[in-house]
Amino acid sequence: MKLCGFDVGLDRRFFLIAGPCVVESEQLQMDVAGHLKEITAALGIHFIFKSSYDKANRSSGASFRGPGMDKGLEILAKVKKDLQVPILTDVHTESEIPAVSQVVDVLQTPAFLCRQTDFIRAVAQSGRPVNIKKGQFLAPHDMKNVIDKARAAAKEAGLPEDSFMACERGASFGYNNLVSDMRSLSIMRETGAPVVFDATHSVQLPGGNGTSSGGMREMVPVLSRAAVAVGVAGLFMETHPNPPCALSDGPNAVPLKHMKALLETLVALDDVTKKNGFLENDFGV
């Protein structure tokens, strides 16, 4: 698959989608994107900057949602232009898609909406690549149906059918908890779509703090190492210079100062994993 001008797949180094959970300010976006661009370039990692102009799914109605679509897209467009980095953001309704598609390079679908057929069809017909998140309630093999919906919609619109990624972000495990079944990364490869592992939302504790979600950010390195050892096309991580002060998802955000060391480890592991190939592909023979 071609994504933002580069090839992605299990024969390539993982690409990185990263940034603050939500657009807090123009300066924060520029600072984080600039730092991530510098360290990913040094490590030979293709980088896509991520941030949300609106967080439609919040634990409390009083939680910060973001600057809104108009202001948020203005800031994201400035990051894209000034730093020359591709941009990913999530859309929440069909009505948002046309305007957002004019600004960003990649769209993302919220996990809770992966079964919404009309919504999936609409993003698939946007003309942009789409990172489709697997719902916390969905079995990994059921992502084939989601990807097939997107491909069918793209074909109807005369658009490329290979513009979709399948993203794992954990599975519900009782109340206020998620677990990551690493088998899902291998199973979702059967969709034929590049698989992305969301290492930060996978350590979220949804609603675990009452009016906000908790998280175990110390588990991000653990799960991201495991995912890279399994083999993924891409990684997704939210990061912030001061996670305790982040306005959204701070408990599961990677401290920005630790991103370089974490990525160095993951690159070394990725190189070994992909150099040696995937023996499991031969086990069914």
UniProtKB/Swiss-Prot annotation:
One of its GO terms (molecular function) is 3-deoxy-8-phosphooctulonate synthase activity. It is found in: Cytoplasm. Its EC number is 2.5.1.55. It comes from the Bacteria. Pathway: Carbohydrate biosynthesis; 3-deoxy-D-manno-octulosonate biosynthesis; 3-deoxy-D-manno-octulosonate from D-ribulose 5-phosphate: step 2/3; Bacterial outer membrane biogenesis; lipopolysaccharide biosynthesis. Keywords: Cytoplasm, Lipopolysaccharide biosynthesis, Transferase. It holds the Pfam family DAHP_synth_1. One of its GO terms (biological process) is keto-3-deoxy-D-manno-octulosonic acid biosynthetic process. One of its GO terms (cellular component) is cytoplasm. It catalyses: D-arabinose 5-phosphate + phosphoenolpyruvate + H2O = 3-deoxy-alpha-D-manno-2-octulosonate-8-phosphate + phosphate. InterPro entries: Aldolase_TIM, DAHP1/KDSA, KDO8P_synthase. Gene3D superfamilies: Aldolase class I. Belongs to the KdsA family. NCBIfam families: KDO8P_synth, PRK05198.1. This is 2-dehydro-3-deoxyphosphooctonate aldolase. It comes from Delftia acidovorans (strain DSM 14801 / SPH-1). The lineage of its organism: Bacteria, Pseudomonadati, Pseudomonadota, Betaproteobacteria, Burkholderiales. The gene is kdsA.
